[in-house]
Structures are given as structure tokens and as C-alpha cells.
Amino acid sequence: MALAFEVNTFAHAEEAGERVHAADSLHANMELADSAVTETRMQHIKKKVKHAGNVFYRFVKNFDNYDTTYISPNYYNFTAMLQNTNSFQTYKFQGKNEDGLRQTISTQPAPSVKVGPYFGWRWIFLGYTFDVAHPKAISKSTEFNFSLYSAMLGCDFIYIKNTGNFRLRRTTGFEGVGNKDFYNADFRGLNAKTVSFSAYYVFNHKHFSYPAAYNQSTVQRKSCGSMLLGMGYSKQEVNFDYTQLPSELLGTGNDERIVDELKFSKISYDYYFISTGYGYNWVFARNCLFGASFMPSVGIRKMSGEKLKGDELFNDLRNFSFDCTSRLGLVWNNAHWFAGASFISHLYLYRKQRFSLANSVNFCNVYVGFFFNRKKQYR
């Protein structure tokens, strides 16, 4: 009995061992299968990441992809430049009363004249400028202007805030007051802020170079133009205290001269737009270029706090607005040294039935500079 018992025990133990071995084998096979699946997934993810990276690289590469018979590339990595930037802004208010009397008030903040060095890498320029004309006005005005130009895409960002440092320029429609009677008179009844961002696409970017005219990173060799398409957003805030105007414009008692339409206190609105236009670079001599572009925009204007339904939005033309961005550039560039000037103007319009506001933001740049650190492929 003991022997039989021992034999049976051994047989059971052997059977149990086989089951354990089979279970271990199954577990090992499952681990191998999971490992294979994981490795396959990782390879798939790596392929996806590599493909996405290649697509992104080609997309970025196309920023400066052009026909070299029309456009000479930048042979250098870096740029040093000295620039003079002149900026000025104009606000024009116009009101018309029920009797048809039209009055306008034009005013400007103190213009800024800035000089400073810039350092560039490819399309990106960084620098610092000093206001040499009105250093005391710095505390009353904040200004930031950024533009990016590449062969295919470009963008503009503007932030300007002015608090009380305005001067009257022109007044019309006021009885007994000449157009220039209060020219350059202080006006502390206006605070204003402008924020704007826009981006655009250059259709004929292989032959037409925006950078050649406005950031000197390439040289246009043959005259050429291109259609432009963009979109953007802007916000305007204007706080207006008409009682700060000269008493001759306001009148007294029953002899009130200013129309009610100009007695507003605040305007604040958002503007969402699309824009289209055309740019042209004229090569009028070797290494010499004159560029011009014009981009009007149309979009929806929404007053702050205003809620509009779809039918109200599109049936009332007063909810639509029209703005414009214009550029001019004159450049001499021999691919190592360069000098030139550019003018950029942004016009923002606001209209109601008997009131309109025009805000014009303008920048004029004069510059001279050179390139250095030649790229490896051009050494």
C-alpha cells in the first residue's frame, strides 16, 4: 500500500508539474505576444511621428521656398541693423445732426521718433529703440509693433495705448471757428487703445518676395506681383470727454455749438475680418526695389456687451465694417549691405447712422545694415 501510495503521489506530482509548466509556457507566450503588439504599436507611433515631423519640416521649409531666377536667397545667418522708426496715429471723429450740420474733430497723440539697433536671425528681428523726440511722453503712451515676413506667410501684431497726450489738428463745421484755429492745442479728454492681429498668405510666393521689400532677408531680381489673402481680429477702445474741448467749440448756454452726435463717452468694439489684396515689387535698377501692397478687409463688428442673433447680424449692414492695410517699401540691397525705407499704414473705421470714427496707425522706418556669418552651403 505504501508503495502504491508513493507511486500515485509521484504521478499526481508529475501531472501537477506538467500543468504548472503548461501554465508558465502559456504565460510566456502571452508576454511574447504582448511584447510583439507593443513593439508594433511603438513602430507605428514612430512612423506617425516621423511622418508628422517631415510634414512640419516641409511646411516650414516652404516658408522660404522660391524660384531663384526671381529671388536671391539670403546668404548669411545673421543681420545687424540701425533703424529709425517714426510712428504717428490720427483719430478723426465726425458727427452729423438731424439738420444735416456736419462737424469733424481730428486729433493726434504726440508722434514718436525712435532710434535703435536691431539684430536678426533669418526672418526674426529683435531690437530696442529709444524715443529721442518726446521722452516725457513715454509714461502716457505704450506701443508694441511686431511684423513677421516670410515668402509664403506673414503676420502683424499691434498694441497701442494712449492716455491723454493728444493734440487737436483740425476742426470743421463749428460756427465762427476756423479749421486751424486750434491746431496743436492740448486735448486731455481722449484715452484710446488699439489691439490688432492679422495673418495672410502670399499666393505667388515662389516669384514674389514680401521679405525683399520689408525685412531685407532676400533680394527681388525680377519685377513680380501676387494676390494676398488674410484674416484677423482687432479691438478698439475709445474714451472721449467732449467737455475737455476748447470752450469756443462747445459754446455756452443757448449758444451750444457742438452737435449731440459728438457727445459720446465711450466706444468699445471687436472686429473679426477677412482681407484680400495685391502686392507688387518693381525692380527698377540693379539691387534696387520699390514695393507696394494694398489689403482692404471686410468683417463683423461687435460692440462690447452686445448680443446679436444670426438674422440681426447679417441683415443690418451697420454690423459690417471695412478696414485697410497699406505698405510701401524702397530698398537697395546688394546681398551684403542694405539700406532703405518703408511705410506701413493700418486704417480702422467705425460708422453709425450719423457718426463715424477713423483711427489711422502709421509707421515709417528708415534703416541701414549688413549681413554676416555666411551660411555653409554658400561658402
Regions found by a protein language model. Give the residues of each.
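Transmembrane beta-strands of outer-membrane beta-barrel pores
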Residues: 84-90, 121-125, 130-134, 150-152, ...
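Membrane-embedded beta-strand positions of outer-membrane beta-barrel proteins
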Residues: 80-82, 117, 126-128, 155-157, ...
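Surface-exposed strand-loop-strand hairpins of Gram-negative outer-membrane beta-barrel proteins
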Residues: 88-114, 125-137
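Outer-membrane beta-barrel translocator/channel fold
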Residues: 85-89, 93-98, 104, 158-196
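Outer-membrane beta-barrel "beta-signal"
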Residues: 196-199, 360-379
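Outer-envelope beta-barrel architecture signal
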Residues: 74-80, 113, 122-124, 142, ...
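Extracellular/periplasm-exposed beta-strand and loop segments of Gram-negative cell-envelope proteins
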Residues: 104-116, 168-172, 181-194, 238-271, ...
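Sec-dependent signal peptide cleavage junction
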Residues: 7-72, 376-379
